[in-house]
Amino acid sequence: MFTEKGIFPIGDGLLDVDADRLKGLLVSCPDINEIYEVEQTPFARGKFAAVRRAIHKNTGSHFAAKFLKRRRRAQSSDKEIKHEIAVLMLCEGEDNIVNLNAVHETRSDTALLLELATGGELQTILDNEECLTEAQARHCMREVLKALKFLHDRSIAHLDLKPQNILLAGERIEDGLKLCDFGISRVVCEGINVREMAGTPDYVAPEVLQYEPLSLLTDIWSVGVLTYVLLSGFSPFGGDTKQETFLNISQCALTFPDNLFGGVSPVAIDFIRRALRIKPNDRMNATGCLDHIWLKDDCSLDRQIYLQPQSDAEEEEEEDVDDDVEDEEEEEQVEEEEEETQNVEEPTTEAPQQQQQPVQQHQLAKSGQIHSKPTHNGHHRANSGGSISKIPIATSKLQSTPSSETTTAIHTLTSNSNGHVHKPTQIVTPTRRASDSDKENTYTATFVKKPVATIQLGSSNGIEDATVVATLTLFPDAPTTPKVIRKTPTGESNGSATSVKALVKKFQLEDSSGSAVARRSGGAVTSSSGLHSPTTTSVRLNSIRRASEPLTTVYKKQTSQNGCSSTSNPSSSPGSSPTTSGSTATLLIHSQRLGNSTAPASHCVAVPATATATSSASSSNSSSGKSTSAAHHLHHHHMHHHHHHHHHHVVIAAKNAAAVAATNNLSLDQGIIC
């Protein structure tokens, strides 16, 4: 594939150079400044390269020293650098490609001593003049395509064709152009699939964005974009963002506004359209672009550009002459008909006035039969619903009585009043067809649905097994402790001074006693809500939702067993009191020392680590039976039931211990540790 000795492919579209072949270009001196006088300020800079002017100290020759970093993104870039050197060596001697003169290597970078193009970049001319003339653009594209053809004949795709990589050999475009920067070029041939996501956003082809195999025709897409930019000064697919630009490229959203392409020849637009095809196989190759009529022959192109408007003008003149002849014939026929009508009318003053209107109507009808297009001042206009046609009617030769006046009137009427029936024009917008690979450019719409307040899902087992899904709000409140509002007990409403701490703890004991009674009785649970009045209300456990619970909470109704109502998760019932709502209710009651205790230490309940409530109650001989039976029952329940059901038994024991403490006149501050 490559005739050059010492250059060979290494895979992934890259080339390598043999060490013996590379020695002929390497500069033996370790310091480049000893041989060349290198300017410190670069006149071109890229991501991984900087170009500075270098002057040979012995010969005085000027070069463009391109300094390439040998490490990019913490990885070695020796393969890419050698590939660029190999491509430049293959292009040695080509007039439209910069030549490589020498290579200098250091630990940090590699310097390529390239041919210096004194005219600078083509982008500089576009920045100063906005766009080129069509003759300049044609000459520029011809030079670029010659360089591309040289590369494509060697199965090399440039893949980064843009005005910044096209250099002027002199001050003018006519002095010659040279192609440069082969850093992302790749070898593309049959049997080698090369996929690269590299290039300039405005110039990349659709197959690059779709990560499809590249080909030599990928450069032809950039040729079409470059031609568009040179003729108009604007990017054909440029958007506000890169994503919008890529979408326009994938859909080939190509337009030619009149304010940009009003003076551009149709063959130039045809050249752009043939190059900008979504499918690579539908595009022209480099040879086909050079053979296109826009680039092939300047003289024939100029003749076609100037002869086409001239032929259009001649056709318009012929149509005008035919229309004038038809107008004269029409006027003669109208005059004859009016004379015949005037001969049969009576010599009265009202008859001519009554007869003039039918004559005019007949004339208009006749005019509609003769002309398919209305005329206005000798110019043709298309028949549209909103257009106005002015038709002159000649009546100067009519004989009239002294009481009547003959005038020449111009009647204005809409063009849809003609005799011919015109079909309405149907504007059909051509459907833009994307490539087969363009399957990801879809538009999605987001619909926001508000949740339903409460949804009840029934089951075949009846109402008791039904599941209630409560979905109340999209933004639940922050998890906070519910506030408890209660009235002052009537027994302490007198003037006796009682501490707030004692009252609160007394309320906790009373509420614990009330909850225990409710759990014993079964059925409904009596509780007080933190946001309502303190009156007790019988409610279902599955009808209340905390503000701190998740967005959607599922509650299941439980059936009562053994006369005791319980839930699988007591902490999720907001109607319970603070003593029973969690597993951290701290209640430790100490009674007075008693000599005789019938409750041994082994009967004390070993509460799990998650619960910190422990009941250790000892009393006199009369109350020891209650404490012993309560502790024994709690221990027995812990051995045979799930550990989540231990809370209400602790409350029962606490209630009995509180009753014992009340009978022994214990103070509240002595028996509670918060």
Curated annotation (Swiss-Prot):
Active site per database record: D160 (proton acceptor)
A Gene Ontology cellular component where this protein is annotated is: nucleus
- Which spans does this entry mark as compositional bias, Low complexity? 352-363, 512-525, 565-583, 614-631
- Enzyme category, top tier: transferase
List GO molecular-function terms, semicolon-separated: ATP binding; protein serine kinase activity; protein serine/threonine kinase activity
Q: What is this protein called?
A: Death-associated protein kinase related
Query: Which positions are annotated as binding ATP?
Result: F43, A44, R45, G46, K47, F48, A49, A50, V51, K66
Residue positions where Phosphoserine is found in the record: S384, S387, S435, S437, S521
Q: Give a yes or no for keyword ATP-binding in this entry.
A: yes
Q: Which UniProt keywords apply?
A: ATP-binding, Kinase, Nucleotide-binding, Phosphoprotein, Serine/threonine-protein kinase, Transferase
The UniProt regions of compositional bias labelled Polar residues, in chain numbering, are: 526-541, 555-564
What ranges does the record give for the region Disordered, renumbered to this chain? 308-388, 412-440, 511-583, 614-650
Q: Where is the composition biased (Acidic residues)?
A: 312-343
- Quote the Pfam families the UniProt record gives: Pkinase
Question: Boundaries of each Protein kinase domain copy?
Answer: 37-295
Q: Which organism is it from?
A: Drosophila melanogaster (Fruit fly)
Q: Quote the gene name from the UniProt entry.
A: Drak
Family that this chain belongs to: Belongs to the protein kinase superfamily. Ser/Thr protein kinase family.
